[in-house]
């Protein structure tokens, strides 16, 4: 959810004030009131009292930091990660999972002006199947930093563990650090990505200078000893396969191959449940024609094709369209077609849209789908499922559908990223008869 602030800040006196927190926003900040103004205070939970100092004073709200906590909420928990509070990855490990879900659901309900029907969640720990770790060589100590960015900073937190990572990936952290820290090229490493696929574990190393034969041999030995598929990335365009074959993951009974750099949902458990619920909400029938917009490489498109008469997937990235077509062939799905289109243009005029669609699904990026809402309305589908990673743009885009006679039939909060401030959601719109 985007927040916008003006650059001008008011001078604060650093006076210590005592506040009582009555709410938690979707970013994990405690919310209190003082002198008629809303205060946002990181680290505090509802039912907690604390002494705080104001750090930023605006006309309608202020920000504060904790000086001393005077009481603890019954929903306060001890963070599992020793880096919590410094690392910018997680913001809510101090809150119970139930409180996190309630606060995010409440924020979503306020934006959408509709009750949240359900929370789609899975395991709250060990859920991330993909991580990108920054690398930085420290000349003074001749050591390699490996970790995530600090909150509000470009500095790196040198992580030793990360409990939200898939266990296989977390166990690799010290081994990867030791291997990379022994390379001659450790001054010229950008980042390393770790991915846990169904087919196995991937390591993608971004390096900014050519690797010596000794370094390449060391990396190959490491990949073989740990059973990793190894990829080298000398720049943003080139990806060299050193070991391993095309990776794949299981999704709703299908096997989907992907390139190591392709986007895949990081939370496999929630993704499976999300796809299953989307198909259920659309109530896909054997005679249905279904349109999937912003389809990527077919996360929803291919499962839809197992139930519908025909499915069209439309995507703006050519490489993902090609991957979707490849996965359709691999899974023996002949009733699905993928098209590369500019979704800012009127896709209803394309030949594949002339017979219309009964159901539509869309899963846009954070910018939302303002450019296609009128096109969807022209198609007059009976049901629409909108999957969103930004509730602000979801609320904006929903207005067009509501004005066109659609109603919100179901609203779900997707707990895709427990312990963080990320809020994802899914809505079912039905056309009023």
Swiss-Prot record:
Entry binding sites for S-adenosyl-L-methionine: 265, 294, 299, 315, 342, 363
| Superkingdom classification of source | Bacteria
Where are the residues marked Interaction with RNA as a site?
132, 149
Please list where the region (Interaction with RNA) is annotated: 23-40, 58-63
Q: Which Pfam families did the record assign? A: TRAM, tRNA_U5-meth_tr
On whether Iron is a keyword of this UniProt record, the answer is: yes
What are the BP-aspect GO terms?
rRNA base methylation
Q: Give the reaction(s) catalysed.
A: uridine(1939) in 23S rRNA + S-adenosyl-L-methionine = 5-methyluridine(1939) in 23S rRNA + S-adenosyl-L-homocysteine + H(+)
In the record, the note on similarity to other proteins reads: Belongs to the class I-like SAM-binding methyltransferase superfamily. RNA M5U methyltransferase family. RlmD subfamily.
Q: Which PANTHER family match?
A: 23S RRNA (URACIL(1939)-C(5))-METHYLTRANSFERASE RLMD (PTHR11061:SF49), RNA M5U METHYLTRANSFERASE (PTHR11061)
Q: What does this protein do?
A: Catalyzes the formation of 5-methyl-uridine at position 1939 (m5U1939) in 23S rRNA.
What is the name of this protein?
23S rRNA (uracil(1939)-C(5))-methyltransferase RlmD
Task: State the organism named in the record.
Answer: Escherichia coli (strain K12)
């Amino acid at each position: 959810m985007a927040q916008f602030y003006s650059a001008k800040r008011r001078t604060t006196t650093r006076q210590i004030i005592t506040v009582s927190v009555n709410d938690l926003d979707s970013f994990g900040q405690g919310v209190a009131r003082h002198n008629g103004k809303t205060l946002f205070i990181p680290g505090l939970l509802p039912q907690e009292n604390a002494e705080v100092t104001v750090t930023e004073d605006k006309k309608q709200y202020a920000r504060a930091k904790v000086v001393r906590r005077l009481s603890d909420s019954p929903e306060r928990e001890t963070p599992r990660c020793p880096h919590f509070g410094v690392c910018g990855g997680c913001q809510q490990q101090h809150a119970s999972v139930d409180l996190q879900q309630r606060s995010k659901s409440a924020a979503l309900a306020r934006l959408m002006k509709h009750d949240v029907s359900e929370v789609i969640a899975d395991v709250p720990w060990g859920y991330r199947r993909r991580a990108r770790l920054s690398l930085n060589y420290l000349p003074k100590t001749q050591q390699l930093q490996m970790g995530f960015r600090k909150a509000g900073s470009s500095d790196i937190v040198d992580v030793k563990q990360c409990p939200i990572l898939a266990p296989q990936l977390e166990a690799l952290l010290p081994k990867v650090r030791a291997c990379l820290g022994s390379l001659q090229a450790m001054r010229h490493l950008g980042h390393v990505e770790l991915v846990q696929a169904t087919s196995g574990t991937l390591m993608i190393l971004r390096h900014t200078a050519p690797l010596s034969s000794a370094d390449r041999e060391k990396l190959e030995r490491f990949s073989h000893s740990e059973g990793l598929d190894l990829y080298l990335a000398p720049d943003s365009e080139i990806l060299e396969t050193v070991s391993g074959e095309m990776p794949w993951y299981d999704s709703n009974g299908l096997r989907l191959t992907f390139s190591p750099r392709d986007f895949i949902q990081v939370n496999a458990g929630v993704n499976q449940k999300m796809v299953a619920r989307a198909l259920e909400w659309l109530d896909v029938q054997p005679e249905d024609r279904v349109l999937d917009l912003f389809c990527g490489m077919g996360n929803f498109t291919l499962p839809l094709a197992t139930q519908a008469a025909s499915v069209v997937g439309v995507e703006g990235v050519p490489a993902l369209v090609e991957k979707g077509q490849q996965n359709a062939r691999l899974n023996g799905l002949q009733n699905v077609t993928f098209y590369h289109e500019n979704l800012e243009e009127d896709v209803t005029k394309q030949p594949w849209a002339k017979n219309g669609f009964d159901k539509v699904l869309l899963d846009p990026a954070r910018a939302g789908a303002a450019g296609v809402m009128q096109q969807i309305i022209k198609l007059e589908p009976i049901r629409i499922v909108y999957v969103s990673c930004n509730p602000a743009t979801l609320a904006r885009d929903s207005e067009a559908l509501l004005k066109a006679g659609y109603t919100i039939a179901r609203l779900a909060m997707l707990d895709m990223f427990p312990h963080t401030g990320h809020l994802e959601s899914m809505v079912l719109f039905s056309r009023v008869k």
